[in-house]
Amino acid sequence: MRVVIQRVSKASVTIEENVVGKVGPGFMLLVAFNDEDTDADLDFAVRKIVNMRIFEDEQAKMNLSINDVKGAILSVSQFTLFASTKKGNRPSFTKSGNPELASKLYDQFNAKLRATGIEVQTGQFGADMQVELVNDGPVTIVLDTQNKE
């Protein structure tokens, strides 16, 4: 599982000219799964995202979590995070998860995020989406549950 976490002042996702998800301050998450991901990977990612202290406190130090700032999350599936560019100029997506499994994991991931009490808006799995965001900082962190650094 890979998640690109972006601290945003606002973000939205549009499908066929309809805004389907929109948040103010918080996180924009781009989320991808592979066939080896498990419930433990979902739990690890949710725990890290919810507790990650990357919002500034009164001293301008990154010391606050999304809960502390009462932020919201916009979660968008993006299988291209598992692209391989090893050979040639056209990316390979064979490491991306089976769409049926990935869709199920995406729904479970968002449910686990919501269970923490944080507002979670989403895109639509597999849809062609337009994502708009205003990066705050910018602060962008890549979380990979297979490479826990």
Swiss-Prot record:
A Gly-cisPro motif from one monomer fits into the active site of the other monomer to allow specific chiral rejection of L-amino acids. Keywords: Cytoplasm, Hydrolase, RNA-binding, tRNA-binding. InterPro entries: Daa-tRNA_deacyls_DTD (IPR003732), DTD-like_sf (IPR023509). GO terms for cellular component: cytoplasm. Its EC number is 3.1.1.96. The keyword RNA-binding applies. It comes from Pediococcus pentosaceus (strain ATCC 25745 / CCUG 21536 / LMG 10740 / 183-1w). It comes from the Bacteria. This is D-aminoacyl-tRNA deacylase. One of its GO terms (molecular function) is Gly-tRNA(Ala) deacylase activity. The gene is dtd. The keyword Protein transport does not apply. SUPFAM superfamilies: DTD-like.
